[in-house]
Curated annotation (Swiss-Prot):
Record membrane topology: Peripheral membrane protein
Species in which this protein is naturally found: Mycoplasma mycoides subsp. mycoides SC (strain CCUG 32753 / NCTC 10114 / PG1)
Keywords tagged on the record: ATP-binding, Cell membrane, Membrane, Nucleotide-binding, Translocase, Transport
Record lineage: Bacteria, Bacillati, Mycoplasmatota, Mollicutes, Mycoplasmataceae
Chief localisation class: membrane
Name of the protein described by the UniProt record: Energy-coupling factor transporter ATP-binding protein EcfA1
Length: 408
């Protein structure tokens, strides 16, 4: 039986994929606009002299945008009707016993269901699927941040402010309890600060946009075992890409490229848990790199590794620094690592006590010892040589130190 007339009528009435994409694009554009207005409003109310007219204008614009979002959200009804239309088509075609046409009609039902679900996800997500714009070249800006774990506890973070520029490699150091890991948890949204603000590329992070802001971030934790989900290295890297809804056709190249960047392309078919500690951490870094975050946070990423593993991870971090395509924030106990950084942030009992170049920190051995931090190895060697009357110029690594000694 020829069902072409039935399909022709259906095609003239159905909602297309282009219609869905146009609806979602329009909706996301309004969510982006609302986020920008929220940023403007927050910045305005924090000023000493608030312009009441400007405040009223922003509030009015926020209301107008919310009305538009509500209007577009109401189109869900049309997509529900579209699903009913496809289901009606399927019922009609099923009666004809033409299997090819039945499969074709069934596929139309699946498409209509998928489109309705996609639209609902965007609406229910309230803009969580949008990508925030970069409003500034400052990757991370923390202003007067304070946090305590409970009313009876002292501040774990006490009025801390600092900035990290796009492409910088910055380390945060401090003894146990200094607050460095707390800052990491606040940045990724695990904890909420009681006071102060965080900006990611100029976007003020708040309850409404935390999910979008986190898309700028990739994090490598202390214990890579906790990050493994897949049965192979390849599957583990793929897991994050699937969650990000990357085109499956593009995934093999992305997986291979990220594995090559950390020297683990040979292990793609291996089980992650059977690898060495350093290799596991390299896989964790590859999984993060595959998602292409603008900011990479290394939270004590070398603390559980043997010396060989530590060296391998630090070499990867230096390679990333040299590309200047990623902003690197490393929270670390490893005092030798700070020599690779552009800038060092020092915390003590929740307070920011110093921001300086690595060599400035290494040179001030009394300062480090007063806040219970180890002096990096090159600093200790220089100190011992100076005691014996041998003056050595400041060096940032062991190779430079050996070269200086050989010249004596």
């Amino acid at each position: 039986m020829d069902n072409s007339a039935i399909f022709e009528e259906f095609n003239s009435k159905k909602i297309s994929q282009d219609d869905l994409e146009a609806t979602i694009t329009s909706l996301n554009n309004y969510f982006v606009k609302l986020n920008d207005l929220n940023n403007q409003y927050i910045n305005l109310i924090r000023q000493d002299n608030i312009d009441k007219i400007e405040k009223q204008n922003i509030r009015q614009q926020q209301k107008q945008v919310k009305v538009e979002i509500k209007k577009i959200s109401a189109t869900t009804k049309l997509f529900k009707q579209n699903l009913k239309l496809a289901e009606s088509l399927y019922k009609k075609i099923k009666l004809t016993n033409n299997q090819d046409d039945i499969n074709k009609a069934k596929h139309e039902v699946e498409i209509a269901k998928s489109m309705l679900l996609q639209l609902k996800e965007v609406i229910n997500g309230q803009g969580k699927s949008i990508k925030l714009k970069k409003l500034s070249d400052i990757a991370i800006e923390i202003n007067h941040l304070s946090f305590k774990y409970g009313p009876e506890f002292p501040n774990a973070i006490d009025d801390v402010s600092f900035t990290i520029n796009q492409g910088e490699y910055v380390t945060i150091i401090g003894h146990n309890g200094s607050g460095k890991s707390t800052i990491s948890k606040i940045l990724i949204g695990v904890l909420n600060a009681q006071h102060g603000e965080i900006k990611i590329f100029g976007n003020i992070v708040n309850d409404h946009n935390i999910e979008q802001a986190r898309k700028f971030l990739g994090i490598v934790f202390q214990n890579p075992d906790n990050q493994f989900i897949g049965s192979t290295v390849e599957a583990d890297i793929a897991f994050g890409l699937e969650n990000k809804r990357i085109d499956p056709k593009k995934m093999p190249d992305i997986i291979l490229d990220s594995a090559k960047k950390v020297g683990m392309e040979w292990a793609l078919k291996k089980e992650p848990l059977n690898l060495s500690g350093g290799q596991k951490q390299r896989v964790a870094i590859a999984s993060t790199l595959a998602l292409d975050p603008d900011i990479m946070i290394f939270d004590e990423a070398t603390s559980m590794l043997d010396p060989k593993g530590k060296r391998e991870i630090k070499e990867i971090m230096v390679q990333l620094r040299e590309t200047r395509t990623k902003t690197i924030l490393s929270i670390t106990h490893d005092m030798d690592e700070i020599l690779n950084a552009d800038k060092v942030i020092v915390l003590d009992h929740g307070k920011l006590v110093r921001v300086a170049k690595p060599l400035e920190i290494v040179e001030d051995k009394d300062f480090l010892r007063n806040i219970q931090l180890d002096v990096p190895f090159v600093g200790l060697v220089r100190e011992e040589l100076e005691k014996k009357g041998i003056k050595i110029a400041s060096t940032q690594n062991i190779d430079e130190l050996v070269e200086q000694i050989c010249k004596k």
